[in-house]
Curated annotation (Swiss-Prot):
The gene is tgt. Keywords: Glycosyltransferase, Metal-binding, Queuosine biosynthesis, Transferase, tRNA processing, Zinc. Its EC number is 2.4.2.29. GO terms for cellular component: cytoplasm; cytosol. Substrate binds at residues 93-97, 147, 191, 218. The lineage of its organism: Bacteria, Pseudomonadati, Pseudomonadota, Gammaproteobacteria, Pasteurellales. This is Queuine tRNA-ribosyltransferase.
């Protein structure tokens, strides 16, 4: 993988990730949003439908794909691309966040994490080395190191110990990745909770080891938005400019805009797909809650500005009807729309950076939603 940086507008960056795959060269234009395909599928969508929304890269989940279908089935197919028939780039997370989410079912030691398999209850073990081996079998174009996702709230001492162990795990991940002869990209993950000095130590340690890109982890885990913005403002300028920056597990449309505003290149989140299944649909001026009875006889499209299959063909009343009847097509049409909304937003962001008018775009984006522009956190202190 290569990262090319074309243009900046303030802290916002316009570039691309370039991947050499057996099927040819693939570019992922950045800033990019990656739909989440936890179990090797973006829920309810064929790969062709996902591609039609504008997605150029997907996220797969190492932890869940390891438990089901497992490495052996994956190897029999070739890799995850062959298994799910998506022959464009795939990023896989390392399983660290899922293990963190298990709470009391897990025990973290220096060696790795022992936990109870949520499917059948058996005790299993995941380590940095094992995560690298699973992701090698998945054929991930971008592999994430195995880390501990520091919870919120956490004391300074806990966040420090957690971050230091994540750094040791980062080195073990790098070593096993190299031993396997993996020619794909490996990203480090910056930890340190809401503490700026810990984030700095984490980044310096990762840069010393050397990675193809750097993710900001341990945000969007319950901390106030102001803390997330402050950490991004602090750490992004210190990440090597020739490497992509990835904000993990984020988020709402506003979070994408705020991330780009602070120098982030890549995002992933289940929000567009999960919200679609729950009838929360993103539109130009906010959200349509399609379950609201006021849409029962509304013959207008979901979003007149949207060019997706759903908006071009169906009314709000039809989407309301499908949801009310529990029809699978409703969830599918909602998902197509929400994914397209996210990709259109990213395309608008990229164009605004190219035209060096990103600050104006931010003002327009919030004005459409009737919201104020959030202040920059560190600028307020000076």
């Amino acid at each position: 993988m290569k990262y090319e940086l074309d243009k900046t507008s303030g802290n916002a960056r316009r570039g691309r990730l370039v991947f050499e795959r057996p099927q040819g060269t693939f570019s992922v234009e950045t800033p990019a949003f990656m739909p989440v395909g936890t179990y090797g599928t973006v829920k309810g969508m064929t790969p062709e439908e996902v591609r039609a929304t504008g997605a150029e890269i997907l996220l797969g989940n190492t932890f869940h794909l390891w438990l089901r279908p497992g490495q052996e089935v994956m190897r029999k197919h070739g890799d995850l691309h062959d298994f799910m028939q998506w022959h464009r780039p795939i990023l896989t997370d390392s399983g660290g966040f899922q293990v963190f989410s298990l709470g009391k079912l897990r025990k973290i030691t220096e060696e790795g994490v022992k936990f109870q398999n949520p499917i059948n209850g058996e005790r299993i073990f995941l380590s940095p080395e094992k995560s690298m081996e699973i992701q090698y079998d998945l054929g991930s174009d971008i592999v994430m190191i195995f880390d501990e996702c520091t919870p919120y709230p956490a004391t300074f001492d806990y966040a420090k110990k957690s971050m230091e162990m994540s750094l040791r795990w980062a080195k073990r991940s790098r070593d096993r990745f190299d031993e396997l002869g993996n020619k794909n990209a490996l990203f480090g993950i910056i930890q340190g909770g809401v503490f700026e000095e810990l984030r700095k130590v984490s980044l310096e340690g990762l840069v010393n080891i050397g990675f193809d890109g750097y993710a900001v982890g341990g945000l969007a885990v319950g901390e106030p938005k102001e803390d997330m913005h402050r950490i991004l403002e602090y750490i992004c300028p210190q990440i090597p400019a020739d490497k992509p920056r990835y904000l993990m597990g984020v988020g709402k449309p506003e979070d994408l805009v705020e991330g780009v505003r602070r120098g982030i290149d890549m995002f992933d989140c289940v929000m567009p797909t999960r919200n679609a299944r729950n009838g929360h649909l993103f539109v130009t001026d906010g959200i349509v809650k399609i379950r609201n009875a006021k849409y029962r006889d509304d013959t207008s499209p979901l979003d007149p500005e949207c060019d997706c299959y759903t908006c071009k063909n169906y009314t709000k009343a039809y989407l309301y009807h499908l949801d009310k009847c529990g029809e699978i097509l409703g969830a599918r049409l909602n998902t197509i729309h929400n994914l397209r909304y996210y990709q259109r937003l990213m395309a608008e962001i990229r164009q605004a950076i190219e035209d060096d008018r990103f600050d104006d775009f931010v003002v327009e984006f919030y004005a459409r939603m009737g919201k104020p522009v959030p202040p920059l956190q560190l600028a307020d202190k000076s």
